[in-house]
Amino acid sequence: MHLDSSVAARLINDIQDCHILVVGDLMLDRFVDGAVTRISPEAPVPVLSQSTSQQMPGGAANVACNLAQLGARVTLIGACGDDATATDLAAELQHFPRITFIPVTVAGRPTSLKTRYRASGQQILRVDDEVSIPISDSAQGELSDRVNAVLDTADMLILSDYAKGCLPLTLIRSLIDAARAAKKLVVADPKLADLSVYRDVDVLTPNLQELASAAGTSLTELDAIGATAARLAKTHNIGTIMTTLSARGILASQGDGTQFHDPARTRDVFDVSGAGDTVVAVISAAIASGARLPFAVALANRAAGVAVGKSGTAIVTAGEILAHMPLSKPVIEANALAGI
């Protein structure tokens, strides 16, 4: 199967009709750039002379922004604090008119803020201002109520879990059950090693480290990765496990042994911030619009290639993905990965 620009354009056009509900950990990503010209006299550390600062939505909010840039209608729900970071995040999201933002405000809880300091484009320090304890039972109840209020109008539920406390285990399970009862597609970007929590989801999107953690073993060879993912998919009744493999692309595995592997395309890597969110967004949007699995994988892989070439938390446009199409190659489809 071959994904060319005309096929990709049709897939992206179909995304315009989708309403996708994103629930998960909200973050604000801040980037401080400057130059290092001396070492501090107070300690043997570099002194950064700041020149610019920018901020953008991160975590589940970045997934929502990527979906909106593809043309989907998005409802974003998550917990945040009653602080300046939450105000800044809401202001940034106003730049995306296709996103309806429904925050659950938790008094006294800091909104996750990740500040990256860069010198000459090279990250030298990251400071995380956040807590990771689960949100309170009352906040979980409020979040669940807000999800259920809009679930019937959505085509898909995406759970974007960064293990920052917005999605405790019991809440994940209840949201999946509610979505299945409403006959909605469910995609989960997991952080928990116990994949039984994600039972019955349509798509699970771990990276290789997360898959290995779930399997309780190290994984390096492609055939072993595929076999392990297929086994876990069958065990937990997961439709497809899409494992992101960094420089090796994306591998989709199903419980019956079906595999789709799309190798990564060589590009200069500038910044990987948010690239995983881009993959989740594009795969989800393509599947929600009715795209076949190999095409969804290939489209997401092209988007990832664009994302890593960008500075800051990546938000990829439809035009950028289409411009990347000349590098596309056939998707490998096989029931066994021998010889790959």
PLM regions with names:
Residues 1-37, 325, 336-339:
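Positively charged, low-complexity intrinsically disordered leader regions
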Residues 235-239, 265-328:
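Conserved post-catalytic alpha-helical subdomain immediately downstream of the catalytic base
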Residues 100-109, 114-151:
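Conserved phosphate-binding/catalytic loop of the ribokinase/pfkB sugar-kinase fold
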Residues 15, 151-152, 195-199:
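A short, aliphatic-rich alpha-helical micro-motif
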Residues 153-166:
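Short acidic, glycine-rich surface-loop motifs adjacent to enzyme active sites
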Residues 164-259:
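Conserved phosphate/ATP/ADP-binding segment of small-molecule kinases
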Residues 21-23, 126, 155-158, 187, ...:
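Structural motif
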Residues 2-11, 41-113, 141, 324-326:
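Substrate-binding N-lobe of the ribokinase-like
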